[in-house]
C-alpha cells in the first residue's frame, strides 16, 4: 500500500509540471526541483540537468513579481533538488522510480525544444 501511494504521489507531482501556473514561481520551483533532483539521482547526465535547470531558473525569474519572490522560489528549488537528488534512507521517503523520472525528464526536454527554450 505504501509503495502504491508513493508512486501515485510521485506521478502526480511529476505530471503536474505542465499544470504549474505561470504566476506561481514557488510551485514551479518546487515541482522542477523535485523532477531535476530525481533526474540527477537517476543518472541523467549533469549537463542535461543543468541545462534544464537554467531554463527553469529563467522561467522562475520571469514569473516572479520582484527579485525577492524570485530569490525565495530559487531557494525552494534548491531545497527540493537536494532532497530529491540525495534522499535519506527513510523507508517513508518519496523516491519515485527512475523509469518514471527519466520519462518525465525527457518529456520536459522535448517541451523545451519545441518551445525553443534551450
Question: What does each of the following model-derived ranges do?
Answer:
Residues 17-22:
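Sec/Tat signal peptide C-region and signal peptidase I cleavage site
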Residues 11, 24, 87:
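Generic anion/oxyanion-binding catalytic loop in active/binding sites
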Residues 46, 50-118:
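Compact alpha-helical subdomains of small soluble proteins
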Residues 23-40:
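Short N-terminal segments immediately surrounding and downstream of signal-peptide cleavage
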Residues 1-4:
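Positively charged n-region of N-terminal signal peptides that target proteins for export
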Residues 6-16:
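Bacterial N-terminal signal peptides
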